[in-house]
C-alpha cells in the first residue's frame, strides 16, 4: 500500500496496528434494533495490546480485504446473514448472560465491602477469561473471516455481542486474532494482562439496566448506607419526652419561678399563660393560689390546694407507746422578790449563783439539772420574782411538771406570790409550798398556812392535796424532804417521753454574746437533739453548731428533760417559743417565713389607727398626744421582753411610749443612727455601746442610758414621761376687794377706789368682777396704787386704787375676787 493511500483520512482499512474507533462511547451498554425485536448484548471494552504476530497477520490480510471489497452485493448479503446468526445466538445466551451478570454484581458488592476492588477484579477477569476465552476467540474468527470477504458500506452498523473486544463502526476487533493463512500459521500469543482499572460501583448497574433507568437503579455506597443506618439509630435513641402531668400542691401564695418548677414547665410558658389572664409578672414575683390554679389547670396539671399553715404539719409527731421511757421531772421555782428562790437552788445544786446577781434579784431565767445521791435527776427552772417578769413566770409554769412556790416566813404572801399561784393553777400543775427562812427568829409558820387558805392552797395536814414544807435554804434545813416530795409527785405523775426520733422542746432563754453569736437555752421535751441537727424555733432557724450543758461542758446530744445551750441559729428566738428538728433547711426556712408573715399581719392589725386630724396636728407640731421614742437593748430576750411589757403598761393618755426597736446584744451604730433619725433615747440593760457606737452617739448627740436593775430603768423612764406631760394649772384664791368710789382720770381712765375686805391682792394677779353675784368680767389687775404710789400688794383692811386691763365698766358696789394661777408638775 502506498503512502498516498495511507494518508487518506476517510478511508477505513484494517491495516492499522490497533483497531480503534474514530468516535468514542461513554457508556458500555448499547442497543441494536432488529426486524421486530430488541436485543441487549454486553460489550466489554478493554484496552488490549497485541503482539507483533497479530500485527503481521493483519498486514497480510490487508490485501485480501481490499480485494474482497469489490466482490459485490453477494459478499454483503453473506456478511449480513452471519451477523443475524450472531444476534440469534446472543438471544439464546441471554439467560446465561443474566446469571453471569448477577455473579458480577455480587462480586462488585464484595469488592466494595472489602475495599480491595482491584484484586477481586483481576481474579474474576482471569477466571472468566479461562472459561470463555477459547469460544469467544473462535466466534470472533468466524465473524472476521466473513467480514473480510464482505464489501464494506458506509452505513453505521452497531453490534452488541457477548464477545470481548473493541467495538468499531464496522465491526469488532478481537483481542486475540488467528492468522488465516495456512501456509504461514502463526499462533496468537496470550493477550497481555495489564492491571485492570478500578471498577466504578455504578458499572454493573449501567450494564444491567436501560439508559432511562440507570439513575433509579443505582446502588448506594456502603458508607451512605452506614450513614443512613446511624441516622435511623440516632432517631430511635433520641425520643421526644412525653409531657408529664403532675399534681401540684398550691399554697396561698407562690412565686412564679417556684410554680413553674413544681409543674416542670418553662417559666416563659407560665408567664405567657399569666399574660393571657391579664397579669404581668416575672419569675421573682408571687401570685395567689386562684391564679395559679387557673394556669395549672390550663396546662393540664392537677391542683391540690393547701393552707399556708400546713407547712407546720411536718412538726406534728406521735410517739409510740413502746418507745416511751421515764424522764426526770422539770421543776419551776417561783415566788416573790428576795424570798430565797435562787438561794434554794444554790443549796440544791451546791453552787453560788445568787452572789453574781445585781440587787439580789434574778435578771433572767436559768435552767439547772441536779443529780441526787441515788442517781435520780431533777431539772430546775429559776424564774424572776419581779412583777415585770410575769411573762417569764407564765412560761415557766407552762413547761414544768411541778411548781415550787417559795414564801418567806418573815414576809408572808406578796403580790408576786399570788401571781405565781394563779400561773400554776392555770397550767394545772402540782404545787409544793416551801416556807423559807425558818431559821430566822420570831416567825409564824401557821400564819403563812392560814394566808394560803385564802388562795385555795390547803396543806395535807388540813386535808388538802398541797405539800407545805418548812425549809431553810441558808442552813440547808429540810432540803431532803423537799427532794423526796418532788420525786414522789413525779412518780405519781408517771412522767415519760420518747428519746427516739426528732427532738422538740421549748426555748427557755436566748441572748447574743460577743464572739459566739446567738445563744439559746432550750429544754428538750421529746426525742434526742444532736449536734448538726437543723432546728426551727419561732422565726429563727439554723444548724446546731455547738451544745453545752448547764455546767458549761460541751455535749453531742441531749435527751428529754435535759437543759442545754446551743449556738447556730440565725437570730435569737423569743423565750417560750417551741423548737423542732426538721429534715432540710428549706423546710425550716419555709416555716420561718410563714411565721414572720403571720406576726407582721398581726402587728398591723393591732396597730392603732390615726385619724386625719391627728395627722394634721402632728404635722403642725400642735398634737395633743406626745411621744417618747425608745430603743431597748438587753443581754437576754426575757429581760428585754419584761422591760418592754412594763413600759407599755405605763399610763399613756398624754404621752405615748413608742418602742422603735428592741433586741438582744450590745448597742451598735445602727441603733444610734435610728435614734438620731427619730430623736429617740437608747436604753441599755446589762449591755454597753461599742467604741464606734459611742463616737457616733457623741457626734449625733444621742442620749444613751445604762441600767443593771429593772427598778431603776422603769423609774427613770416614768420620770422622763412625766416631764413631757403638760403641767397642771390650778387657780388659788388670795383675796376679795369691794369697790366704793369711781374716779375718772383723763390719761389713765377709770380708777376704782376699793377696800380689801379679805386676804391680799397682788399686782398682775387674776381678777373676777362680780355684780349681783354674777361674773361679768375676768381678767388681770393692771394697776395697784396706794396714795398715788404704785405698790405690789395690799393686805386686808387697807384702801387702794385698782384698774383692770382693757375693761372700764366698773360700778360702785361691785365685788372683785383676786386669784393667782399655780402650775403643778403632773405625775404618771
UniProtKB/Swiss-Prot annotation:
CDD domains: IF2_eIF5B, IF2_mtIF2_II, mtIF2_IVc. Its main location: cytoplasm. PROSITE patterns: G_TR_2, IF2. Residues 48-76, 112-148 are annotated as: Disordered. GTP binds at residues 335-342, 382-386, 436-439. Residues 382-385 are annotated as: G3. Residues 49-58 have a biased composition (Polar residues). It is found in: Cytoplasm. Keywords: Cytoplasm, GTP-binding, Initiation factor, Nucleotide-binding, Protein biosynthesis. GO terms for molecular function: GTP binding; GTPase activity; guanosine tetraphosphate binding; translation initiation factor activity. InterPro entries: EF-G-like_DII, EFTu-like_2, IF2_II, IF2_N, P-loop_NTPase, Small_GTP-bd, T_Tr_GTP-bd_dom, TF_IF2_bacterial-like. Residues 436-439 are annotated as: G4. GO terms for cellular component: cytoplasm. It comes from the Bacteria. Residues 127-144 have a biased composition (Basic and acidic residues). Residues 65-74 have a biased composition (Low complexity). Residues 116-126 have a biased composition (Acidic residues). One of the essential components for the initiation of protein synthesis. Protects formylmethionyl-tRNA from spontaneous hydrolysis and promotes its binding to the 30S ribosomal subunits. Also involved in the hydrolysis of GTP during the formation of the 70S ribosomal complex. Belongs to the TRAFAC class translation factor GTPase superfamily. Classic translation factor GTPase family. IF-2 subfamily. This is Translation initiation factor IF-2. The gene is infB.
Amino acid at each position: 500500500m502506498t503512502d498516498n493511500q495511507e494518508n487518506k483520512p476517510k478511508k477505513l482499512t484494517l491495516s492499522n496496528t490497533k483497531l480503534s474507533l474514530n468516535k468514542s462511547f461513554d457508556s458500555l451498554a448499547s442497543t441494536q434494533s432488529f426486524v421486530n425485536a430488541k436485543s441487549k448484548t454486553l460489550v466489554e471494552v478493554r484496552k488490549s495490546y497485541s503482539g507483533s504476530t497479530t500485527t503481521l497477520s493483519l498486514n497480510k490480510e490487508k490485501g485480501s480485504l481490499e480485494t474482497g471489497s469489490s466482490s459485490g452485493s453477494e459478499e454483503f448479503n453473506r456478511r449480513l446473514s452471519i451477523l443475524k446468526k450472531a444476534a440469534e445466538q446472543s438471544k439464546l445466551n441471554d439467560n446465561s448472560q443474566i446469571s453471569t451478570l448477577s455473579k458480577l454484581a455480587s462480586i462488585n458488592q464484595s469488592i466494595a465491602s472489602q475495599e480491595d476492588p482491584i484484586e477481586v477484579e483481576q481474579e474474576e477477569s482471569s477466571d472468566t477469561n479461562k472459561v470463555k476465552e477459547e469460544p469467544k476467540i473462535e466466534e470472533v474468527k468466524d465473524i472476521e473471516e466473513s467480514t473480510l470477504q464482505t464489501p464494506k458500506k458506509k452505513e453505521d452498523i452497531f453490534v452488541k455481542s457477548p464477545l470481548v473486544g473493541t467495538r468499531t463502526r464496522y465491526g469488532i476487533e478481537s483481542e486475540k486474532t488467528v492468522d488465516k493463512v495456512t501456509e504461514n500459521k502463526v499462533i496468537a500469543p496470550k493477550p497481555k494482562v495489564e492491571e485492570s482499572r478500578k471498577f466504578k460501583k455504578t458499572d454493573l448497574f449501567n450494564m444491567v439496566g436501560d439508559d432511562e433507568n440507570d439513575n433509579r437503579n443505582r446502588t448506594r455506597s456502603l458508607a451512605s448506607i452506614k450513614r443512613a443506618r446511624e441516622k435511623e439509630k440516632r432517631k430511635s435513641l433520641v425520643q421526644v419526652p412525653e409531657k408529664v402531668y403532675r399534681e401540684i400542691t398550691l399554697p396561698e401564695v407562690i412565686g412564679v419561678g417556684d410554680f413553674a418548677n413544681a409543674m416542670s414547665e418553662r417559666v416563659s410558658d407560665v408567664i405567657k399563660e399569666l399574660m393571657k389572664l391579664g397579669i404581668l409578672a416575672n419569675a421573682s414575683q408571687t401570685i395567689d393560689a386562684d391564679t395559679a390554679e387557673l394556669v395549672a389547670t390550663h396546662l393540664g396539671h392537677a391542683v391540690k390546694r393547701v393552707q399556708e399553715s400546713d407547712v407546720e404539719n411536718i412538726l406534728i409527731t406521735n410517739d409510740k407507746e413502746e418507745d416511751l421511757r421515764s424522764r426526770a421531772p422539770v421543776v419551776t421555782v417561783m415566788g416573790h422578790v428576795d424570798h430565797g428562790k435562787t438561794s434554794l437552788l444554790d443549796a440544791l445544786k451546791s453552787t453560788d449563783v445568787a452572789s453574781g446577781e445585781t440587787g439580789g434579784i434574778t435578771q433572767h431565767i436559768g435552767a439547772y439539772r441536779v443529780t441526787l445521791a441515788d442517781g435520780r435527776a431533777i431539772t430546775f427552772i429559776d424564774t424572776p420574782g419581779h412583777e415585770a417578769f410575769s411573762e417569764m413566770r407564765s412560761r415557766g409554769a407552762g413547761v414544768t411538771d411541778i411548781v415550787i412556790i417559795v414564801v418567806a416566813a418573815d414576809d408572808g404572801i406578796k403580790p408576786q406570790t399570788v401571781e405565781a399561784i394563779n400561773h400554776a393553777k392555770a397550767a394545772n400543775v402540782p404545787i409544793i409550798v416551801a416556807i423559807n427562812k425558818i431559821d430566822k427568829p420570831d416567825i409564824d409558820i401557821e400564819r403563812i398556812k392560814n394566808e394560803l387558805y385564802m388562795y385555795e392552797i390547803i396543806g395535807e395536814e388540813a386535808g388538802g392535796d398541797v405539800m407545805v414544807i418548812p425549809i431553810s435554804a441558808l442552813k440547808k434545813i429540810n432540803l431532803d424532804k423537799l427532794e423526796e416530795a418532788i420525786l414522789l409527785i413525779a412518780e405519781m405523775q408517771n412522767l415519760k417521753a420518747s428519746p427516739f426520733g426528732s427532738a422538740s422542746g421549748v426555748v427557755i432563754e436566748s441572748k447574743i454574746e460577743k464572739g459566739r453569736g446567738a445563744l439559746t437555752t432550750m429544754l428538750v421535751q421529746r426525742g434526742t437533739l444532736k449536734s448538726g441537727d437543723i432546728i426551727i424555733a419561732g422565726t429563727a432557724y439554723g444548724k446546731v453548731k455547738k451544745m453545752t450543758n448547764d455546767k458549761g461542758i460541751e455535749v453531742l446530744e441531749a435527751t428529754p428533760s435535759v437543759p442545754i445551750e446551743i449556738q447556730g441559729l440565725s437570730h435569737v428566738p423569743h423565750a417560750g417559743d417551741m423548737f423542732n428538728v426538721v429534715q432540710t433547711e428549706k423546710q425550716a426556712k419555709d416555716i420561718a417565713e410563714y411565721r414572720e408573715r403571720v406576726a407582721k399581719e398581726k402587728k398591723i392589725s393591732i396597730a392603732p389607727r390615726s385619724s386625719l386630724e391627728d395627722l394634721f396636728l402632728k404635722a403642725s407640731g400642735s398634737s395633743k398626744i406626745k411621744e417618747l421614742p425608745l430603743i431597748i437593748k438587753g443581754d437576754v430576750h426575757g429581760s428585754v421582753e419584761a422591760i418592754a411589757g412594763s413600759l407599755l403598761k405605763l399610763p399613756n393618755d398624754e404621752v405615748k411610749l413608742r418602742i422603735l426597736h428592741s433586741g438582744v446584744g450590745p448597742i451598735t451604730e445602727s441603733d444610734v443612727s435610728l435614734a438620731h433619725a427619730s430623736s429617740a433615747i437608747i436604753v441599755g440593760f446589762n449591755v454597753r455601746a461599742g467604741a464606734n457606737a459611742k463616737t457616733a452617739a457623741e457626734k449625733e448627740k444621742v442620749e444613751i442610758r445604762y441600767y443593771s436593775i429593772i427598778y431603776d430603768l422603769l423609774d427613770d423612764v416614768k420620770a422622763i414621761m412625766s416631764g413631757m406631760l403638760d403641767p397642771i394649772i390650778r387657780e388659788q384664791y388670795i383675796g376679795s376687794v369691794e369697790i366704793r368710789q369711781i374716779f375718772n382720770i383723763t390719761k389713765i381712765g377709770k380708777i376704782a377706789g376699793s377696800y380689801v375686805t379679805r386676804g391680799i391682792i397682788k399686782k398682775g394677779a387674776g381678777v373676777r368682777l362680780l355684780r349681783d353675784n354674777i361674773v361679768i368680767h375676768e381678767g388681770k389687775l393692771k394697776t395697784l396704787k396706794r396714795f398715788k404710789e404704785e405698790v405690789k400688794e395690799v393686805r386686808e383692811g387697807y384702801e387702794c386704787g385698782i384698774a383692770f386691763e382693757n375693761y372700764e365698766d366698773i360700778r360702785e358696789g361691785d365685788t372683785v375676787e383676786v386669784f393667782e394661777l399655780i402650775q403643778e408638775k403632773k405625775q404618771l
